[in-house]
């Protein structure tokens, strides 16, 4: 039986693994161990003679061929961005597919058999479009993508597969090349369930590399008066040296940085030769590492947990190999991290375990992911009405009944948005469609059932059905938006920043909606009442409705509230009078019927009865 391999398609590095005889094994790259261990750099390059290079060979020639080299393509997944290389253009899916093709080839060489099925991981914050783009990349590479799963979830599988004896609250600290993801999960009875996610899209190993680069460049500038950061070739060499030093200082106390012929001046060639200690590295990266507290606190808040309630701490990503990073996070949470898994390999191993679960090779594990942002429909006044809240476990299917806003309305527009803001316009539009053929009826009568269905890959399907006619329309949310992980973080920050402003805006819209409903209700009551309401009262209430509608149009909330209170009170009084009148008429009619049915001649007739002996 063919294997399902697990793939960590990373921004900086990629890796793959497979379960053999019940044990996860990392698939070695054909080039052997690189600076990233068994993982290989997510680089794709095209030479001027038309050759394509992937992985370490592409990275090695980047200095000499910068215009033909592409890296960090993952950041553009789910967008319509095109990478321009010489006279050709490539989509992010194509570049990712080249990386996946290399993985496929390496896996087939390692296993000695065709490999066609895969589980691919994505960041927890990836939206529907980015997940779909990742799946498309797998298809382009020749894979049948069986599942798209979140990277922190995969890591938890890697650490937890042999430790399913009791219930756990797990915090996954995933610090990669460019981003930090903090995920809190609940584990029990073989089920992993994501409780919350948080992160920082501008915090990662590259920030640490940049701090080292600046230290070296500042030192050189002080001595030579030259800023090497302005020379692209010199900068790339500095960056590579900084990354190498950072990795070496995870296991040693000092390392030498030797960069001969870094630049040339009128006085001749210049060189860099210096020693960097672990203590100096820790001093340089300390301000960067301190920023992890915010995302950790947010994740704890989202999961409604205290630091003391976390029972397992899992590290993922190359920078978590740095002793200072590990100690800082462990001290902040007051718990030692789990060992036994290389943080650089954890995600690929977890994906491989999920592949084995799907194949039935590993049993008694169930994987439950969550949707990172709230999914809503736009309703009257531009309000985003939530259907599926953020951090809802997927797969999930939820429905809600809506109605029409106008009399005899035969078409409704379903506008799907994603985000945490109360108003639709402040969120990201995922798509829209029209449901036509609704049976004409007064507003508020038709019943439109809107259903959001998210599958196990996080792909969203939306349908709308008119309950009366059975008319149905739907949409699958694919690449219709350019929402990135950065935008998700921005949206969450904006949601906090503008919370009070949003609350007031939403309250105003709801007030105006309620006012319009009251005006409509009063008009309908007066029309239905006919001559049961005297002419003078009708005119007075009609004028009040006109005044209210004018205030609604002017969006004068204070005036709207005053007029609503008066109109509500007046219509209630009219309603009470109509009820009393109807009640009096009913009693009068009942008495009349009683008198008429008593006797036709007005005499009382005694019934005869015989006593039973």
Curated annotation (Swiss-Prot):
UniProtKB keywords: ATP-binding, Chaperone, Nucleotide-binding
Superkingdom of this protein's organism: Archaea
SUPFAM superfamilies, per the entry: Actin-like ATPase domain, Heat shock protein 70kD (HSP70), C-terminal subdomain, Heat shock protein 70kD (HSP70), peptide-binding domain
Xref: Pfam families: HSP70 (PF00012)
Single GO term (MF): ATP binding
Entry keyword annotation includes Chaperone: yes
Region ranges (Disordered): 578-613
Comp. bias regions, Basic and acidic residues: 603-613
Gene3D superfamilies in UniProt: 1.20.1270.10, 3.30.420.40, Actin, Chain A, domain 4 (3.90.640.10), Substrate Binding Domain Of DNAk, Chain A, domain 1 (2.60.34.10)
Disulfide bonds: none
CDD domains: ASKHA_NBD_HSP70_DnaK-like
Residue ranges, compositional bias (Low complexity): 580-600
Protein family per UniProt: Belongs to the heat shock protein 70 family.
Function: Acts as a chaperone.
Name of the protein this chain belongs to: Chaperone protein DnaK
Annotated source species: Thermoplasma acidophilum (strain ATCC 25905 / DSM 1728 / JCM 9062 / NBRC 15155 / AMRC-C165)
Organism placement in taxonomy: Archaea, Methanobacteriati, Thermoplasmatota, Thermoplasmata, Thermoplasmatales
Gene: dnaK
């Amino acid at each position: 039986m063919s294997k399902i391999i697990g793939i960590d398609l990373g921004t900086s590095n990629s890796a793959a693994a497979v379960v053999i005889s019940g044990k996860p094994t990392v698939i070695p790259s054909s080039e052997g161990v690189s600076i990233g261990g068994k993982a290989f750099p997510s680089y794709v390059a095209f030479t001027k003679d038309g050759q394509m290079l992937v992985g370490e060979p592409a990275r090695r020639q980047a200095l000499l061929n910068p215009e033909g080299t592409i890296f960090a393509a993952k950041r553009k997944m789910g967008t319509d961005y095109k990478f321009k290389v010489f006279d050709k253009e490539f989509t992010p899916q194509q570049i990712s597919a080249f990386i996946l093709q290399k993985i496929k080839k390496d896996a087939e060489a390692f296993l000695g058999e065709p490999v066609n099925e895969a589980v691919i991981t994505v960041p927890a914050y990836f939206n529907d479009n980015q997940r779909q783009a990742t799946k498309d990349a797998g298809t382009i590479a020749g894979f049948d993508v069986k599942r798209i799963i979140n990277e922190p979830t995969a890591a938890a599988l890697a650490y937890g597969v042999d430790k399913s004896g009791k219930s756990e609250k797990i915090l996954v600290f995933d610090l990669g090349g460019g981003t930090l993801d903090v995920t809190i999960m609940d584990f029990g009875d073989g089920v992993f369930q994501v409780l919350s996610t948080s992160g920082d899209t501008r915090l990662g190993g590259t920030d640490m590399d940049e701090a080292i680069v600046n230290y070296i460049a500042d030192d050189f500038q002080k001595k030579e008066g030259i800023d090497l950061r302005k020379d692209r070739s010199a900068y790339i060499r500095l960056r590579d040296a900084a990354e190498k030093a950072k990795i070496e200082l995870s296991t040693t106390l000092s390392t030498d940085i030797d960069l001969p012929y870094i630049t040339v001046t009128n006085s001749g060639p210049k060189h860099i030769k210096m020693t960097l200690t672990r203590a100096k590295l820790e001093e340089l990266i300390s301000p960067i590492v301190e920023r992890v507290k915010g995302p950790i606190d947010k994740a704890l808040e989202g999961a409604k947990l205290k630091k003391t309630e976390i029972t397992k701490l899992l590290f993922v990503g190359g920078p978590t190999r740095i002793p200072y990073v590990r100690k800082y996070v462990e001290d902040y949470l007051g718990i030692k991290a789990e060992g036994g898994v290389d943080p650089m390999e954890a995600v690929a191993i977890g994906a491989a375990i999920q592949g084995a679960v799907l194949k039935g090779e590993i049993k008694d594990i169930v994987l439950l992911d969550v949707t990172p942002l709230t999914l809503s429909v736009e309703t009257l006044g531009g309000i985003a009405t939530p259907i599926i809240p953020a951090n809802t476990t997927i797969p999930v299917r939820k429905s809600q009944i809506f109605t029409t806003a106008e009399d005899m309305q035969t078409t409704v527009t379903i506008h799907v948005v994603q985000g945490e803001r109360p108003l639709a316009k402040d969120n990201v539009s995922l798509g829209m469609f029209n449901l036509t053929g609704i049976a004409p009826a007064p507003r508020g009568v038709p019943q439109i059932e809107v259903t959001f269905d998210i599958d196990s890959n996080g792909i969203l399907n939306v349908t709308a059905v008119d309950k009366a006619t059975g008319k149905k329309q739907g949409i699958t949310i694919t690449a219709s938006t350019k929402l990135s992980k950065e935008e998700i973080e921005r949206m969450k920050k904006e949601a906090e920043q503008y919370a009070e402003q949003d609350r007031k805006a939403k309250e105003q819209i709801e007030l105006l909606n309620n006012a319009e409903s009251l005006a409509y209700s009063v008009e309908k009551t007066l029309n239905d009442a006919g001559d049961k309401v005297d002419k003078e009262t009708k005119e007075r209430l009609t004028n009040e409705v006109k005044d209210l509608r004018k205030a609604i149009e002017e969006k004068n909330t204070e005036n709207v509230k005053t007029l609503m209170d008066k109109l509500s009170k007046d219509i209630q009084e009219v309603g009470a009078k109509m009820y009393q009148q109807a009640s009096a008429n009913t009693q009068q009619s009942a008495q009349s019927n009683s008198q008429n049915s008593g006797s036709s001649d007005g005499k009382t007739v005694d019934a005869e009865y015989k006593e039973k002996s």
